[in-house]
Amino acid sequence: MYKRQVRNTPLAQFIKNYSFFSYSANEALHLSEQERRTIIDCMCKIREELLHPIDKHTKSLITDNIKLLLDYCERFYDRQFETRENVNLDILARFEQTLDDYLASNLPISKGTPTVQYCADKLCLSANYLSDLLKKETGVSALKHIQQKMLDIAKERVFDVTKSISEISYELGFPYPQHFSRWFKKMVGVTPNEYRQNRNN
């Protein structure tokens, strides 16, 4: 019953924004004693409302307290990201190396363009945790990091006139040259051929 009530509240819309629900067990939240007491206090309030006879305030009080609990969890995860700076920098370096290795290999031809999930798996992290960590450290999501890395490489290879645009597109993991051209134009503002011609001019 309460599950149905929550589903029909604003909380149901907000809850998908809490990306930590997709974190894996090794990315669990490590609470200080004060943080632990805050979480327990929130849970006790929710429990009290669940045990209280239902009235017109029940629904809003339960959902408001759940949202408060989730907001505290988000705050404490932000703190955890900030206090693990050395670990985070190591993950960033390994993420960059994973991307470099992937794009320098033949994997794009067989597996396609690199994905956040692929990189996260290689780093033994969940995709959401990796993306959140990168966003906290650099201001840019994992997907945007991948896109920028691919664009830098694409620009370099487009200037190599010994390769056709089709060859370059396959090397980067695009199944069709048209897909690569559309992506390149979206990122740069001109097609690969136009970019190559502008350089030669």
Description of each model-found segment:
Residues Y118-L125, L130, L134, I168-P175, ...:
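Append "Primarily bacterial transcriptional regulators
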Residues E137-P175, Q197-N201:
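Terminal helix-turn-helix DNA-binding modules in bacterial transcription factors
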Residues S181-N201:
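…primarily DNA-binding HTH/wHTH and HhH modules…
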Residues R37, D41-N86, D90-Q97:
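An amphipathic alpha-helical interaction segment
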